């Protein structure tokens, strides 16, 4: 369940569709909703607003518009749900690669917004946790490699056992 104190950014150039998202959020008790109706200077504006979650509605986006939104998702490191009316497998794959937490095709309904928001935040948190765990494992592996290399140097230069070198 999403925290009702979250700041939600709705990016939608279509006022009717943006209203559907906003009403769904407000009906769910989320009151800190900010709407952007243009993508001009989008990253700067996102960093100024500093939202907890971003909902992007693109209806029937061009490939360029989708790529711009994927770039936003890669850059901001926040839960992002993207609503589109139609898609193909390459766009879905690009969305996943960009870190979009939820990619909703033909699913813009006021009644579904809250559950989609909850799923978006949960999926982002799970992915973020896995990313941190992966980085920790990589760091530990690098440390072990360094220790093994140092042990090898000590064993060779001083003629000592592995246990003594450790």
Regions found by a protein language model. Name each.
Residues 4-16, 21-25, 35, 54:
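Conserved acidic segment of CheY-like receiver
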Residues 18, 39-43, 52-72, 88:
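Conserved phosphotransfer microenvironments
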Residues 24, 113-125:
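Receiver (REC) domain switch/output surface
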Residues 30-38:
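Short hydrophobic/Thr-rich beta-strand motif most characteristic of the beta2 strand and flanking loop
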Residues 54, 77-87:
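A short, hydrophobic beta-strand element within the central beta-sheet of small alpha/beta folds
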Residues 90, 108-117:
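C-terminal output helix
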Residues 135-166:
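C-terminal output/effector regions of signal-responsive regulators
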């Amino acid at each position: 369940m999403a925290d009702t104190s979250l700041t939600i950014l709705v990016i939608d150039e279509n006022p009717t569709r943006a209203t559907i998202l906003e009403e769904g959020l407000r009906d769910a008790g989320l009151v800190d909703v900010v709407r952007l109706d243009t993508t001009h200077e989008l990253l700067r504006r996102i960093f100024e607003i500093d939202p907890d979650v971003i909902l992007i509605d693109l209806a029937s986006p061009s490939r360029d518009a989708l790529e711009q939104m994927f770039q936003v998702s890669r850059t901001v490191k926040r839960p992002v749900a993207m609503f589109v009316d139609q898609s193909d497998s390459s766009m879905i794959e690009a969305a996943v690669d960009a870190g979009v937490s939820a990619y909703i095709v033909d699913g813009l309904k006021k009644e579904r917004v809250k559950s989609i928001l909850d799923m978006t935040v949960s999926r982002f948190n799970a992915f973020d946790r896995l990313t941190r765990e992966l980085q920790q494992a990589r760091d530990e592996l690098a440390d072990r490699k360094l220790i093994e290399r140092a042990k090898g140097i000590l064993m060779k230069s001083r003629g000592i056992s592995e246990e003594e070198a450790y």
